[in-house]
Amino acid sequence: MNQEEKIRQIDQTVIDYYSKKAVSDSLVESILYSVQAGGKRIRPLLLLELVEAFGLPLQSAHFQVASALEMIHTGSLIHDDLPAMDDDDYRRGRLTNHKKFGEAMAILAGDSLFLDPYGLIAVAELPSRVKVNLIMELSQAAGTFGMVGGQALDMEGEGCQLDLKELQTIHAHKTGKLLAFPFVAAGLLVQVDKGVQAKLRQIGELIGLAFQVRDDILDVTASFEELGKTPQKDLVAAKSTYPALLGLEKAKETLDQVLDQAQNLLKEIAKNRPFSGESLTKIIESLRLYD
């Protein structure tokens, strides 16, 4: 199954989940508007590619876990775009959810996409112990101790001059935890040993850092057409960013160094057990920026 086919099945898994009789058709319309807005689906693809790299054939349960992750990510984008947060009118090249459906419905759509994923994982045909651990890890990655906590720190840091350590703490939680989840989840699904699981978590944290450095660079250098959203929002909000603290060229060097570290750890995993990570490597390499 190629990546385009995987993306189609990820999307279909979410659509199927909401195809049963809903309490509010308007709510489902708002949810699916954002779910079907496109995007690279990097988080769920990383999870699926990892499962395959360890030699496990993909099953419906794996797509349910991957789709649950994408649902939470999409919910976070809906809330990020709200006037009380980033106040953005466009996401992925079209109107943000609150501009299309109103703020109240957008909030509810985001709420649903934060809560429903746990139900999707719960009904997956997986061992109960694995499902409990997946739900626990996703809760830690998405909630108070992960993405939401990082967003709170990010808001508190607006207009303040943060140092590099403070910035890394914010993004390790705001962006990093949810990007580390595919690696942790794959380890749980494949049931690797503790040593490999620790390496997978470390790789995920590095990818999370790389993703944020990349996002900060693009906010400075990319156009609306390239981003699909308003550029230079961080500058307007007076946020500390990697280019602001390190300079643009040093930020680019940091991005490459972090991605190199992640690739080296993948090679270490491949030395000690069957592991075919070519597709995974391509996804990671796609995060590099070239002049």
Go through each PLM region and give its residues.
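All-alpha prenyltransferase/terpene-synthase fold signal
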Residues: 1-291
